[in-house]
Amino acid sequence: MPDYGLIEMFRPRPEWYALSREERRTFLAGCRREIERLLGGGVRFLGVYASRWSGEWHGYSACECPGADSAQEWIDAAEKAGWFRYFEQANLVGRKMSLEEYFHTLVEL
């Protein structure tokens, strides 16, 4: 069972809009190859969600990771691929716990 979750919220930067459609396709093909490599390491990609209509972020993705290190590896791979040159992003990494465990942490605040 995965122990950590990763949420990535992102929106395009002006540099993305400056690329041609062909340049965008080429860039995203490279990102896809890197994602497929990471999935072989136990990361489970839950999906990408379009959210521009409901908030300030264009979209977000969610993954389950076997550990905090694999979540960080996912973020590092995005940086290496040049993702942050074209997209502003905020990440959340958290440890998975039961509802009861989480409620206990709230009581203990």
Predicted regions and their residues:
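Short S/T/G/P-rich N-terminal loop/turn motif that feeds into the first structured element of a domain
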Residues: 1-57, 65-72, 95-109
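Homeobox/homeodomain signature
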Residues: 35, 81-82
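Short amphipathic alpha-helices in soluble, non-transmembrane regions
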Residues: 72-81
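Conserved short beta-strand edge segments in small beta-sheet-based binding/regulatory domains
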Residues: 83-95
